[in-house]
Structures are given as C-alpha cells and as structure tokens.
Curated annotation (Swiss-Prot):
Gene name of the encoded protein: rsgA2
Enzyme's top EC category: hydrolase
Organism: Vibrio parahaemolyticus serotype O3:K6 (strain RIMD 2210633)
InterPro entries, A to Z: G_CP_dom, P-loop_NTPase, Ribosome_biogen_GTPase_RsgA, RsgA_GTPase_dom
Top-level division of the source organism's lineage: Bacteria
Name of the protein in its database record: Small ribosomal subunit biogenesis GTPase RsgA 2
Entry GO MF terms: GTP binding; GTPase activity; metal ion binding; rRNA binding
Binding site for Zn(2+): C284, C289, H291, C297
PROSITE patterns in alphabetical order: ENGC_GTPASE (PS50936), G_CP (PS51721)
Biological process annotations from GO: ribosomal small subunit biogenesis
Cofactor needs: Zn(2+)
Amino acid sequence: MNQTHTFCDTLISTSNPLKQLGWKPFFQQQLTLDDYDNTIFARVIAHHRSGYLLATEAGQVHLNVHHSLPNMTVGDWVILNEDQQFVRLLDRLSLFSRKAAGSKVAEQLIAANVDTVFIVCSLNHDFNLSRIERYLALVHEADVEPVIVLSKADLCDDVDELKSQVQKLDPLLVIETVNGLDAESTSKLMSWCNEGQTVAFIGSSGVGKSTLVNALLGQQEQSTGHIREDDSKGRHTTTSRSIHLLPAGGILIDTPGMREIQLVDCEAGVSEAFADVEALADHCRFGDCKHQTEPGCAVQAAIENGSLEVRRFNNYQKLLREQAFNGATLAEQRAQSRQFGKLTRNVMSDKRKRQQSY
C-alpha cells in the first residue's frame, strides 16, 4: 500500500475529513449556491510531472496536466464536478513561490494555503544567517507564521551562540533547536500541527528536513540522505512536493531541498524581514538617502556604532535588488504572453470570418 493511498484511507475514517484536510471558513465563503450541488471539494496533495493528485472526502482523484488547467501547487483547493472534472481553483489563503532555478526568469509555485512554515537550518557548516533572512522574506511575503528550526543540535558545540545570532534578526522570532533523531526533541514542533492546521518545511538540501518529517510522522516515509563530512551537503532526498497526514491531525507539506531560491515580487516580505533596517532609514536626514556616503545617514551611523551588521545591511540591499529585477522581468514576460495570446485570438477570429464568407 503506497503512501498516498494510506493518506486517503486515514482521512476517510475521520468524522470530518474536509476539516482535517485544512478546509477553513475562508474557502467556504467563496462558494456559491451552485457549488453545493453535485460538486466535489478537493485539495492537491501531490504534484508530479504527469499531473496532480487530489484528496476528497471519498478518496483520491488524479488530474492530468492540461493547458486549460491553471498553475496549481500542493495545498491548493479546487472544485470538481460530479464526473471528477476540474471546475475552478479557489482563492488562496497563502502562496509560496520563487524564481525557478536556472537563468530563465519564471515563477515556480512551492506550496499554497499554509498556516505555519518551519524554516530549517542545520547547526553545522550549512548555518547561514543570510539564507535564513532570505527564507524569512519569502514567508513574510506570504503572510504566514515562520518558525525557525535549527536542526542537528546534537552535532553542534555552540548551540546557544548560534541561536542567539538568529534571535538578533528579530526579537519576536520563534526558534526551536532540535535533534531529528530524538522524539522528545522533535515533539516541540507538534504544537503547530493540530487538526486542520497546515505546516510546511522549507530549507536547503542536507539540513535534515526528511528526518524531521519522519520524526513527526512517527514512521519512515521519507528517504534520508547521508551527509558528506567535508562540506555537510546532503543528497536531495525529496524530489517532489507532497502532503502528509500527521498523527495529531495536522497536514504537513514537504518540499524538495532547494540550493537556489531567488525572490520574485517580494518587496513587502523583504521589508518585514528587515524591519529594523527600514526603521533606521526613516531617521535619515534625506528621504532619498541611498545609505552610502550621505550626511545624516542613520543606517551608516548604526553600522559604525556596531548596532547593525554590515552583512545584514548588504543582504537587505541584495534581496531588494533581486526581487525587483526578477519581478520586472517576469512582468515583462507576462505582458508579452498576453500580447501573443491576443494576437493568436485575433488571427483565429479572422480565419473563422474568412471561412464563413466562402
């Protein structure tokens, strides 16, 4: 019996499968009276190259990839007709996306309708404050609660020092240090995993996400990769996004390890992740201060007195430039696509008119 079949069997045995799938009033409010007649509410639980796997109250449904389908991702809610054909995609409560890997600027959807995101960073050579800031910008843009999970605490001699460095990014950040192989340690994360709640793990390859998923599930569902001791980089062990049902009733979305994650249209997320830097900028003498050599620059003053790290400020500027460039390029591509679509429709319309005139 495969994992997705077990998922649906467990779901059907509950008294309220839709609630356990993460159905909320937000989605209920989007329904019309017609939607209650001979329709099926389904959630995307896996996305593979061949199509989407959906979970419903009655079991699982497979939708083949087709040009008429909107771009969907794991966690999305959709409406199907009685023949299990796609009707429409419901508005999302939250959406995570990034620039697709590679040189081409294209948006890749990661997960939708998530309540809490566990940002996983291992306490070994992978520990990287700038990467954590990047993930925080992504999570804040989606307006989702972030929880920093510092993994492999058993392999680190200075856990408190590294945790303190992360806490300095934001005094209100929730941070948990865990050993993925210790059940008592990973149980700290269960308070976010109650019935109806959807959580997701994001992090780079080799940080121990699959080990944490196994710990929360209480079984060996995800394969785990060995770590090369010389550089602490793990093999990719999760290659597609999928949903798991947790013992406490919550929904867990696991994502592939991402060595590259570039931001697109993420200005608000960057602003929130670097709220301290922007608060300093409000006190600069000039409203258009570039925070370089201008007199009365509060940002440079904070760098000089040590209250703001040069690294953090440089990363703030880097992420702002990155999201602006990728966003502008993507907007241009969308505009060109719309123009091409309009041109195609006009050509087809003219062709039909000529055929009708004969």
